[in-house]
Amino acid sequence: IDYVKTKLHFPSVCSAFPQIDCAQEFGITQFDVVTMWYVIEHFQDLKSVLTKVNELLKKDGIFAFSTPSAEGVSAKSYKENFFENSPSDHFSVWEPSKANVILKKFGFQVEKIVSTGHHPERFPSIKKSNCSSSSLQWKIVEKLSKVKQLGDTVEIYCRKIRDL
């Protein structure tokens, strides 16, 4: 928080969410953009979080977040291990292909989904061959991961289309 205030000169607070009172903290009730970078998976009650984000955004405002992906190579190749090895404070794992259906219920329209967190070393073929990151096989798998959107994390950008 200190860095954001002193170096970037953005007003910021450390507060509980979704209980924050933005009128008290910032002097305004709605924003053009709300972001949550690797935060959303830590909320137990996603409904109250998405409801609050809708409340905080102006019409046509942008909600952008990143989170682990349940459609990445780790989840697809090692499903049991993926969930067992997920941190205990992760309460949701997003499937990018279903994001629009979920977010629509909370007044959002998905504008863009970006597959991130590409790790060729997590692909079974790379694990078996133990090839180096400079090998042709590695580079092909890395490209395939990006083309097929098999990153282990995802960024989702959506627009508020209606109030709840």
Regions found by a protein language model. Give the residues of each.
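Short, hinge-like loop/turn segments at secondary-structure boundaries
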Residues: 8-12, 81-84, 129-131
